[in-house]
Amino acid sequence: MESPLGSDLARLVRIWRALIDHRLKPLELTQTHWVTLHNIHQLPPDQSQIQLAKAIGIEQPSLVRTLDQLEDKGLISRQTCASDRRAKRIKLTEKAEPLIAEMEEVIHKTRGEILAGISSEEIELLIKLVAKLEHNIMELHSHD
């Protein structure tokens, strides 16, 4: 019988995020909010909403709702792009900086605890294998 690898990977991502979600509860961030803030922080400055949606792997309308909420909380700002008035550039605000620092610390610490007992060579191999799987899936999508 074949291993349900896809289901295993989906479950792993779900429980990994659930653990971080639980640990970030004191910061009053939903999973959607912290995933979005984390991606904004990780990407180069002044990303567009389109680039951010691609990085997170969600549709733009879903992202817009989240960005509206983060903007209402004063954590991000959006400016119209000078070269394309339809595009919006996203920036973290000063108010977001201490929250991002605390959030990133929790994420980094949790990642370290999750990967405890796994060698750096094993982690590198896993990263390469996941990249190959992603490449294969993207190739299949391009042919369909």
From Swiss-Prot:
Keywords: Activator, DNA-binding, Repressor, Transcription, Transcription regulation, Virulence
Pfam families attached to this UniProt entry: MarR
DNA-binding region: 49-72
InterPro entries listed in its UniProt record: HTH_MarR-typ (IPR000835), MarR/SlyA-like (IPR039422), Tscrpt_reg_MarR-type_CS (IPR023187), Tscrpt_reg_SlyA (IPR023071), WH-like_DNA-bd_sf (IPR036388), WH_DNA-bd_sf (IPR036390)
Cross-referenced SUPFAM superfamilies: Winged helix' DNA-binding domain
A molecular-function term among this protein's GO annotations: DNA binding
UniProt keyword annotation of tRNA-binding present: no
Subunit annotation: Homodimer.
Entry function: Transcription regulator that can specifically activate or repress expression of target genes. Required to activate expression of virulent genes.
UniProt-recorded name of the protein: Transcriptional regulator SlyA
